[in-house]
Each structure stands twice: as C-alpha cells, then as structure tokens.
C-alpha cells in the first residue's frame, strides 16, 4: 500500500516526464523543482543559481545527474520501475546522509520504508556502474597521454 502511494507521488512529481522518454536535464530539473516545492508557476531563477541550488541539494551538477540517469538506462542497471525522483532521492541521501525522517521530509514527505528502498536500490545501481565508468575514464586518459606524447 505504501509503495503505491509513493509511486503515485513520484508520478505526480514527474508529470511531464514519461518513464520511457530519455531523461534530459530539463526533465531532471523539473522533478527537482517539484521536490523543492517550486512548481511551474513559481519565479524562474537564473540557470547558474538553479545549478548551484541543485549541487547544494543533490551533491552534483544537473548535467551529471542527467548523465547518471542515461548511463543507468544504457547499461541496463536502472532498478525496475525506478523513476527520476528516486535517483534524486539517492543523490540526496549520498550528499546529506542524514536521519531518515529528515530525508523523507526533504523528499516531499514520503514514507521511510519507501525512501530507504528506492534510495538504496539506486545507490547500488550507481555503484555497479563503477567498472564501466572507471574503465572508460582510464581508457580515454590513456589515449590522451598517448597522443599528447606523440605530438
């Protein structure tokens, strides 16, 4: 029962973003605005201010969060029925690592059990990306060093 309520709340948070659509930065920031209780009708902030707020709240930039979502989908490690708001909960959890009650309040008043479930599913999914992300990084670093020494 609690899971269904949380799912409906996330669907409300993501009313513009389809689960099957590619999550863009605009879709991620719209979900973040809903979590912050800044709906569509509220005053629009400058992009730099909004990115700073996003970094302070979730621990990474908007482009990084969007890229994480895309890589989770591409590598097929996105938790089943996972939504963008769940990813943001996980990022917030890793950034703040606070008491569950406080995190649930910040996440829009969700149930503790639901928050814990989705936050940990996404933390584990992000951790599972380490081998592919780190190996790609090291490969490009190797190529960069190789070509800079040739030139």
Regions found by a protein language model. Name each.
Residues 1-78:
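Charged, often Cys/His-bearing segments associated with DNA-binding zinc-finger transcription factors
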Residues 61-64, 85, 99, 115-118:
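Alpha-helical interaction elements in eukaryotic regulators
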Residues 72-76, 97, 126, 130:
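Short amphipathic alpha-helical segments enriched in hydrophobics
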Residues 81-82, 135:
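Short amphipathic alpha-helical segments embedded in low-complexity Lys/Glu-rich regions
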Residues 83-96:
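Short, amphipathic alpha-helical "recognition" segments used to contact nucleic acids or chromatin
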Residues 95-107:
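Short, charged amphipathic recognition helices of the HTH superfamily
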Residues 105-118:
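Short, basic interhelical loop/turn and adjoining N-cap
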Residues 116-151:
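Active-site- or DNA-interface-adjacent structural scaffold in DNA-acting proteins
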